[in-house]
Design a protein with these regions (language model features):
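Hydrophobic, small-residue-rich alpha-helical packing segments that form membrane-like cores
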Residues: 135-184, 189-212, 216-221, 226
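Exposed, low-structure sequence patches enriched in small/polar residues
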Residues: 35, 50, 57, 187-191, ...
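Short glycine/proline- and aromatic-enriched beta-strand/turn motifs that initiate or cap beta-hairpins
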Residues: 25-49, 354-356
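Long, low-hydrophobicity, solvent-exposed regions enriched in small/turn-prone and acidic residues
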Residues: 52-54, 58, 62-67, 74
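Outer membrane beta-barrel
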Residues: 65-160, 186-188, 268-289
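Bacterial Sec-dependent N-terminal signal peptides
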Residues: 1-31, 550
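Short loop/turn motifs that connect adjacent beta-strands in outer-membrane beta-barrel proteins
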Residues: 21-30, 66-70, 103-107, 111, ...
């Protein structure tokens, strides 16, 4: 444990020392960032918290990049010794997980090594990293971008990162985006801006299956359309994938397809957005045997709001790429200042509704089960909903600045959560109501107190929860006490005893460096970002996070 604390301290000092070295090698510059997350574990049988043999776990990275005119080189050293609980155990180890060379000018941009890339909305190709989820599916290969006035083209050949190795699949892709206004002179000055895009991605993987004849080359293509005029915008993308028998679809030979559409309007004091999506057998990976986080090539986002409040985010929706239909609507309206309803500074009303459901599936014939291995799987009517509801979330939030010192917001949320679909275990679905009050009091310059009161009411799962947080901020320093209480549940699928989860956290920020320490209990739960989720086990102990940039 002492060695790990010294290691974190050493890297912190190294980063602070490098900040003075921003001009090197003939006018080039060095920039980077560093983060270390350490957690000490104590056994707590009351909440199901285990003690790990190492007593302490550390996740850390140091990322550096050197730039000189059109040249750039970078690397990221990573350490998981061992990974913090909740991260995949295959992350255990340390080394350079990311490195690249890059050259760019006005027309050409060439990268060799690791890179992240996204075509369109990402339905058929998206490489990205979420450090707090333990997710990284970066590409390792060559990428070339060519830019003209009206047209930009991207091509790549690469493999995907799979923890400390590379996945078995070879990825080839090309994407093009055309600005119609720049391409056609007659509409060059039009207030209506139109963009068109096309993408194609192919995965090659050797077929070694002794039973089925699996396609070695699997292609997917997508087209997109975007229109902007004033405060109005419309976006739509459609994608299709040829038959791709894989571990996530039970090795069926059905083709996949997906569509996403968004329409929005905004002006002063008013904003509205409506999003729709449908995906059918569209889980696309660079390895046909991969499941979970592994080798994800395409990305189908969850059509739901990503909540920041703890209890509102208790039951997050996990995107179902192989079959879902969903929508999300958001309306934001600000009542005028100096009116009876708006108050002195105006009042903001934020209303959001999201819904996700299964797609309709029909057997291909009387003798074949839906989704049977080695078959075409099923047929599906495009506009027909299935009989299984996955999720819904209705929430409304009112926010008002009372005066220069006080700011208040209240929120109500109603939620339905399908346990089998979202968490994979057979338990009653959750019907929940969440009520939140949030108060900020700025009593002196650079001094404020922030109080949150939250309550979650449900008869299912662990029963009712409540939480109070009191936070003090003073120019670079903050401290917070969080008291989360599970009221227990003796009417659910299992008996849950009441329990208190206290947590104290302190933090200090100096320029671009932030240090945060905490001690207490954390509940078992699910953490999601954009519909990508990981399970987090219960824990009791000390946490330390250091992050900095230079």
């Amino acid at each position: 444990m002492i060695r790990k604390i010294l290691f974190v301290a050493f890297l912190s000092i190294l980063v602070l020392g490098l900040k003075a070295q921003n001009n090197v090698l003939g006018g080039g510059e060095v920039h980077g960032s560093f983060q270390a997350d350490a957690q000490h574990y104590q056994k707590d049988s009351a909440i199901g918290a285990d003690e790990i043999p190492e007593k302490m776990a550390v996740n850390a990275f140091l990322e550096m990049r050197y730039t000189n005119k059109g040249f750039e080189a970078g690397m990221r050293y990573e350490l998981f010794m061992p990974p913090i609980q909740g991260y995949d155990s295959r992350w255990k180890g340390n080394g350079f997980g990311y490195r690249y060379l890059r050259y760019s000018n006005e027309r050409v941009d060439v990268t060799a090594g690791n890179f992240y890339e996204q075509f369109g909305s990402g339905m058929i190709l998206r490489g990205y990293q979420e450090w707090n989820l333990g997710f990284d599916n970066s590409f390792d290969g060559v990428r070339v971008k060519y830019k003209m006035k009206a047209l930009s083209i991207t091509g790549l050949v690469a493999k995907q990162r799979l923890y400390w190795e590379l996945g078995p699949g070879l990825v080839r892709g090309v994407d093009g985006q055309l600005s119609l206004n720049d391409f056609i002179r007659k509409i060059n000055s039009s207030k209506t801006r139109v963009f068109l895009g096309l993408s194609f991605v192919s995965r090659y993987q050797v077929d070694q299956n002794p039973i089925y004849n699996l396609p070695e080359n699997v292609g997917a293509y997508a087209g997109r359309f975007q229109l902007f005029r004033g405060g109005f915008n419309f976006k739509m993308e459609m994608a299709k994938k040829i038959n791709d028998p894989n571990a996530t679809n039970n090795f069926i030979y059905k083709e996949g397809n997906a569509v996403m559409a968004e329409i929005g309007y905004s002006q002063k004091g008013l904003g509205f957005t409506l999003q729709l999506n449908r995906s059918d057998n569209m889980d696309f990976r660079s390895s046909r045997t991969a499941t979970g986080f592994d080798s994800q090539l395409g990305y189908i986002p969850a059509m739901t709001r990503q909540h920041a409040y703890t209890l509102a985010a208790f039951y997050p929706y996990a995107s179902q790429a192989n079959g879902q239909m969903g929508l999300q609507a958001t309306l934001i309206y600000k009542l005028k200042k100096k009116t009876a309803l708006g108050g002195r500074y105006g009042t903001s009303i934020d209303i959001n509704y999201s819904f996700s459901n299964s797609i309709y599936k029909n057997a291909i014939n009387d003798s074949t089960l839906i989704g049977q291995t080695g078959t075409l799987g099923y047929t599906s009517a495009f506009f027909k909903l299935g009989d299984q509801k996955y999720y819904h979330d209705f929430n409304i939030r009112l926010s008002r600045k009372l005066n220069r010192k006080w700011q208040l917001s209240i929120m109500y949320m109603n939620q339905y959560y399908n346990m089998v679909i979202n968490e994979g275990h057979n338990a009653p679905d959750v019907f929940a109501d969440v009520i939140i009050g949030d108060v900020w009091w700025k009593f002196k310059p650079y001094n404020s107190i922030h109080v949150e009161l939250q309550g979650l009411i449900t008869k299912q799962d662990d029963g009712n929860w409540s939480q109070i947080m009191v936070e003090y901020n003073r120019k670079g320093f903050f401290g917070a006490v969080i008291m989360m209480y599970n009221h227990g549940n003796d009417k659910g699928h299992e008996i849950i005893e009441p329990h208190l989860y206290p947590f104290l956290t302190l933090g200090y920020t100096h320029k671009t460096t932030r240090i945060t320490a905490g001690y207490g209990k954390q509940r078992e739960g699910i953490v999601c970002v954009g519909g990508v989720c990981r399970a987090v086990p219960a824990s009791n102990g000390f946490t330390l996070t250091v992050n900095s940039s230079f």
